[in-house]
Regions:
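Conserved beta-strand segments of alpha/beta enzyme cores
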Residues: 31, 65-67, 94, 164, ...
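N-terminal auxiliary segments of SAM/dcSAM-dependent transferases
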Residues: 2-104
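Conserved SAM/SAH cofactor-binding pocket of Class I
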Residues: 116, 120-202
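SAM-dependent Rossmann-like transferase core, predominantly class I methyltransferases
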Residues: 75-139
Length: 275
């Protein structure tokens, strides 16, 4: 299977890598790898849209250069193993790969082999959700994990006592990867993974909705989340940069959601909403 690698380069003293990643994630790439002053984005050759990239207005307005490479037979395991260290979410929780050895015993030991999917806990967006999940009682809850990626949020929800979780992603790689991680964490039968978008939740209701996606999807889907949230339910929204906070707050108010709290980490924000 052939892939197109687009290498974005920039001066890290001029451009924040987190902002670059947030903006280019709006384009149809499957995965990203980061280095100082450089982000590599990957898409299958048949899915790569060169015209969309060249027409992307944000790139025209900012000092970011890019070039294309055609590659095949990527060893994804080798790629993510280079940069994936265990991450401690709290004194009680660690996210690690199967090859990591840890000395300390954690109450919540989450095994995640990310492959190409987003969501290991290293990025501020995922870390914020993992951290705040410990603020709530998931016992017996019905949970929705939108944009599941590796499935790590759904897995933690089950470990925290949720009765079941629906994990949704529009990326086939995420579907496969989340399924593998569900097995690794002995959560089979409790987490259902589906490929698609918010139309899959029509007619369903949840006690907790975990939405760690991007600005455009969040703004478009907030009305569906409000409908799907039980009366005393909680919606955790992540993946929003500071300059987009007001847009999300305005949309949430418009659909009848009430802001309970807001936390920022590395220019990324997590919202806790209730009805």
């Amino acid at each position: 299977m052939k892939y197109i690698e687009v290498e974005f380069s920039f001066d890290p003293e001029v451009m924040d890598g987190e902002i670059v990643l947030a903006e280019i994630s709006e384009l149809p790439f499957e995965s990203f790898a980061e280095e100082t002053g450089k982000i590599m984005a990957y898409a299958q050759e048949e899915d790569f849209d060169k015209n969309a990239l060249e027409a992307f207005q944000w790139l025209k307005e900012h000092p970011v250069e890019y070039k294309f490479n055609e590659i095949s037979d990527i060893n994804w395991n080798e790629e993510w193993e280079k940069n994936f260290d265990p991450i401690e979410v709290s004194d009680k929780c660690i996210v690690r790969a199967t090859f990591h050895k840890v000395d300390k015993k954690y109450e919540y030991d989450l095994l995640i082999d990310p492959k190409m999917s987003f969501g290991t806990g290293h990025h501020a967006t995922t870390h914020l959700v993992l951290k705040h999940m410990f603020d709530f009682n998931f016992q017996g809850a019905h949970v929705l994990d939108m944009g599941t990626g590796t499935g790590v949020l759904a897995v933690l929800a089950i470990k925290l006592g949720a009765e079941n979780a629906l994990a949704i992603d529009n990326n086939p790689w995420a579907f496969d990867n989340a399924g593998d991680n569900i097995k690794l964490n002995d959560c089979e039968g409790k987490i259902t993974v589906e490929i698609g978008e918010s139309e899959l939740i029509e007619g369903k209701t949840f006690d907790y909705i975990l939405a760690n996606i991007n600005r455009n999807v969040i703004l478009a889907d907030l009305p569906q989340y409000e409908k799907a949230l039980n009366k005393k339910g909680v919606l955790l929204v992540s993946g929003i940069m500071t300059h987009d906070v007001e847009h999300v707050l305005n949309k949430a108010k418009e659909v009848g959601l009430i802001l309970e709290s807001l936390e920022e980490k590395d220019n990324w924000n997590l919202f806790v909403f209730k009805k």
